[in-house]
Amino acid sequence: MVSLTKRVLFEVIPNPPDETTLTLSSTTNKGHYISVRPFVNAEGKEFPFEWAFGGTSDHIELKKINERANSLNFNFKFDTNVKLNVPETHRGVIKTVFKTWDSGLVEETGSVFPWGTEGTEVKFRELWQPVDPTRLEFVELNNEKDVDQAANSIALSVDNEEYEGLVIVVGRWIQGILFKKGVNTLDGINLFRSQIDEKNSIVSLVKFGADADKFPQEVLLNEGSITTSKGLEWSVIESNL
Amino acid sequence: MVSLTKRVLFEVIPNPPDETTLTLSSTTNKGHYISVRPFVNAEGKEFPFEWAFGGTSDHIELKKINERANSLNFNFKFDTNVKLNVPETHRGVIKTVFKTWDSGLVEETGSVFPWGTEGTEVKFRELWQPVDPTRLEFVELNNEKDVDQAANSIALSVDNEEYEGLVIVVGRWIQGILFKKGVNTLDGINLFRSQIDEKNSIVSLVKFGADADKFPQEVLLNEGSITTSKGLEWSVIESNL
């Protein structure tokens, strides 16, 4: 089951909640995932993102708690905070619980340790609205299980001497992260979010980084195929086409 | 400007938030309003609503705080808690602040006094997602100001010896409250929520009460006109048709 969820709020407990980003998290049928978190008002910000991360299914551990709740332990392969070595941000596994409310929204709670595992625990809450990934607008799903089972579920990956990256396609929504290896500054980070419109053209919504043109120009591909963009070869590691 | 907002969460501070209802609040151009709050899982509930209330624009006082925030003081004409005399619920004016977040969601904070004005203050938070009232699905608006200026904005009212009621139409969404005067039990309460579909037929979504058939069967009417449903005469007190 693919999933596209739009964040409704972020809360560092016990501070009041807020939402300053347009955050979308995409997950494929096989559990590959990316979350891209651009600020709505990015004026004056050199890096116009709160955060971005992603990984393949081997970077996430899911356990069912009950019909309504799962525990998810994330150990991101890609993490802009780690890449940039942002001080006072978490390293390593993040333990979370995802709980579905009657209304269909999904509450995520967990803890991070910005000052190391021996440091102060910071509890957080995020709230997620499942949206229909096959639509270009944000059309709410009553429950994330109501998602179209036939929606595109595609993942592309690159890992060569110079670059490592991941692109996730769910329905009409594409999100991507591309890191230049060994470059731990903004020059090493590329992010994008696009939509596949009714004519199957890719329309860019968010694009960041010197190498952003290396994100794949075509994504509706079969598993095992290769697509090259500005010299960078991407492998399709999952596709339901 | 009409408004249709879907509640995302309800929080009695400092308890954790939750959302067990599908709550919609509708407000017309002139400021007449209704909020209907049915539980998603109403099994076993004699009254399957958390609450419902409404009023005309003279039952609300709005003051601008800044570009992002307004204070709103509600003094409902219709309030199911008051009608049923539910113990430990608020009476009289409720003072609230509505603040628009960067993401377009609207945070409402305020206090109620369930044990009277001298009793304990209970702080609450609600969070609202503006949705497009001209659509049958829940299509999110980036900002409530993005609403279609031509959307239907209609209010119907009844106040005779036996009944008092209000119906609010914004876009394709209709919500209504009808009280039987002097009957302070569930027998005196009627609530409904409907949609006007593409064929201009009214499709019922929520319908409660012995007199629910008295809600108007036609609502796309001019200001000043009268429509009668099962003997009950409704006056159109606002219409932009």
Curated annotation (Swiss-Prot), chains A, B:
Pfam families to which the protein is assigned, alphabetical: HRI1
- Note the CDD domains from the entry: HRI1_C_like, HRI1_N_like
- Where in the cell is the protein located? Cytoplasm; Nucleus
A single GO cellular-component term from the record reads: nucleus
Keywords (alphabetical) are: Cytoplasm, Nucleus
Q: Which domain of life is it from?
A: Eukaryota
* Family classification: Belongs to the HRI1 family.
Query: What name does the UniProt record give this protein?
Result: Protein HRI1
Q: Which gene encodes it?
A: HRI1
